[in-house]
Amino acid sequence: MATKIFLASPVISATRTPIVPKAIASRLGTSLAAALAATSVLTMVPVLPAAGEGNQTYKIYYGTAASAANYGGYGGNSDRKTSAEYVYDVPEGWKERLVSKVEKGTNGTDSEFYNPKKKTEKEYLTFLAGFRQLAPRDVILNNLALSDVELQDLIAGADKVVSEERKDETGQVYYLYEIDGVGKHSLITVTCSKNRLYAHFVNAPAPEWNRDHDTLTHLRDSFKTVSSS
């Protein structure tokens, strides 16, 4: 497992070497403009909390990739679990924000949930078509920021950005980023699957991050894509 730490320095280089959080890299060879959307379902299956999470319980969210043009269709698939492209956990009591068709077709936002007691404590997922494999970690993060002004600002003012690479039991690579910003914390997980780039975000203001650290890291770790059987 490799870890990279991004600090205030003009150097971009290999693992464990600092780079500038303020640098927003140009662009990948593949355009980020094209985006798919998804149709998804939240199951009522409870997930037991891990040690340190108190009595927090979760539901499993299943997302199935579809084009923005097909968003809102419900016909022909009574069990979306069988066609899920990705899953992640949602804390019991969090609310879903319905993503518009325009959002799905432009910036790739696919799903979003938030804490009704503090709406800026949330998790959401975006995905983009046309990515067969991951680029270097710093390039991926910088290109995500190109279409996300809030992420740009968070990186620009961050005290520290840490990244690492993990592989699951099938060998699929996931990039994990932790951004310690001004008054805000963000956990981002990125992977490629079936020619799509998936990015799962968990964001929280500093007080909620300090209070809900275990829950928020659980959400980060729960995200994965679903392989074809």
From Swiss-Prot:
Q: Which GO terms describe its biological process?
A: photosynthesis
Question: Its principal location?
Answer: plastid
Q: Which domain of life is it from?
A: Eukaryota
The record's annotation in InterPro entries points to: Mog1/PsbP_a/b/a-sand (IPR016123), PsbP_C (IPR002683)
Protein localization: Plastid, Chloroplast thylakoid lumen
Any GO CC annotation of this UniProt entry = photosystem II oxygen evolving complex
Which Pfam families did the record assign? PsbP
| Keywords attached to this entry | Chloroplast, Plastid, Thylakoid, Transit peptide
Q: Which GO terms describe its molecular function?
A: calcium ion binding
Q: Please identify the protein, giving its name as recorded.
A: Thylakoid lumenal 19 kDa protein, chloroplastic
